[in-house]
Amino acid sequence: MRVADFHFDLPEALIARHPLPERRASRLLALDGPTGTLAHRQFADLLDYLRPGDLMVFNNTRVIPARLFGQKESGGKLEVLVERVLDQDRVLAHIRASKAPKPGTRILVEGGGSAEMLQRHDALFELAFAEPVLPLLERVGHMPLPPYIDRPDDAADRERYQTVYAQRAGAVAAPTAGLHFDEALLEAIRAKGVDTAFVTLHVGAGTFQPVRVERIEDHVMHREWLEVGQDVVDAVSVCRARGGRVVAVGTTSVRSLESAARDGELKPFSGDTDIFIYPGRPFHVVDALVTNFHLPESTLLMLVSAFAGYPETMAAYAAAVAQGYRFFSYGDAMFITRNPAPRGPED
């Protein structure tokens, strides 16, 4: 299966670089997977697609202000993007600098704080900070906006590049499907008889890395930490018993649930995942999906194609471009019901 099969042309003007004034003001493109039927709606209309007895599963990870600016003690400027917090004062990070720091190099953080480079792990650097790292990031860190937003972060991003239900700090990218939900919409969803549950997947910077191989099967996924608790397993079981659907909010929720059900049965799971879902891979848990519009040739577009079917997905994206939908993290959303017999690009 070729990566190029997942290319589509996207005008620059359709890349959303700022959020809309209200979270639920986005548009919603509904795709019925079994029929390929499309409906152009507003995100607040999501309620029309939910049924009493359904279960919505959200990712409650919290984005940390993971980008730091600073310099080596010798004077060379650098930029640090924390990838993973290892413990109270140690992290794995990407570093952009004219010359990579060597072990023992002291880094002075702009705004206050310092760290020592301990060792290198392939493309990542292990850093030890002189103080607890999460409070330091909250004090002097910058929100790690995706590269395609192409602007400095501002004060509004601290609130808007974060879901209203974010709890567990550790992500360096937002689970963006969740950005559309405000407290009032969540209350309305529960009032309709739809249950909610929360998984955690700390989204890594690898989510933005392009696929650099020609054939999908040769791609190696980045690893991310996730946790699916017994409460989620029980909620899914109750939902199934009453004939409800499991509605995943975001591809990270999909990857969490399907990682915890790799043998076909959903079980509690805590640890790293490198699950790669593309056309031909089965889904064991998720029946419907809320998701944003993804980058051309990205692994997330491949996941959506596996869920809805390749021709249906690409037709929906073509319609979204033609209708001027806003794309990517701060953009519009889709509601998709799973296609029971999805076709791939080679079918």
Swiss-Prot record:
<comment type="pathway">
    <text>tRNA modification; tRNA-queuosine biosynthesis.</text>
</comment>
<keyword id="KW-0808">Transferase</keyword>
<protein>
    <recommendedName>
        <fullName>S-adenosylmethionine:tRNA ribosyltransferase-isomerase</fullName>
        <ecNumber>2.4.99.17</ecNumber>
    </recommendedName>
</protein>
<dbReference type="InterPro" id="IPR003699">
    <property type="entry name" value="QueA"/>
</dbReference>
<keyword id="KW-0963">Cytoplasm</keyword>
<dbReference type="GO" id="GO:0008616">
    <property type="term" value="P:queuosine biosynthetic process"/>
</dbReference>
<dbReference type="InterPro" id="IPR036100">
    <property type="entry name" value="QueA_sf"/>
</dbReference>
<comment type="subunit">
    <text>Monomer.</text>
</comment>
<dbReference type="Pfam" id="PF02547">
    <property type="entry name" value="Queuosine_synth"/>
</dbReference>
<dbReference type="GO" id="GO:0051075">
    <property type="term" value="F:S-adenosylmethionine:tRNA ribosyltransferase-isomerase activity"/>
</dbReference>
<dbReference type="GO" id="GO:0002099">
    <property type="term" value="P:tRNA wobble guanine modification"/>
</dbReference>
<dbReference type="InterPro" id="IPR042118">
    <property type="entry name" value="QueA_dom1"/>
</dbReference>
<comment type="function">
    <text>Transfers and isomerizes the ribose moiety from AdoMet to the 7-aminomethyl group of 7-deazaguanine (preQ1-tRNA) to give epoxyqueuosine (oQ-tRNA).</text>
</comment>
<comment type="similarity">
    <text>Belongs to the QueA family.</text>
</comment>
<dbReference type="InterPro" id="IPR042119">
    <property type="entry name" value="QueA_dom2"/>
</dbReference>
<keyword id="KW-0671">Queuosine biosynthesis</keyword>
<dbReference type="GO" id="GO:0005737">
    <property type="term" value="C:cytoplasm"/>
</dbReference>
<keyword id="KW-0949">S-adenosyl-L-methionine</keyword>
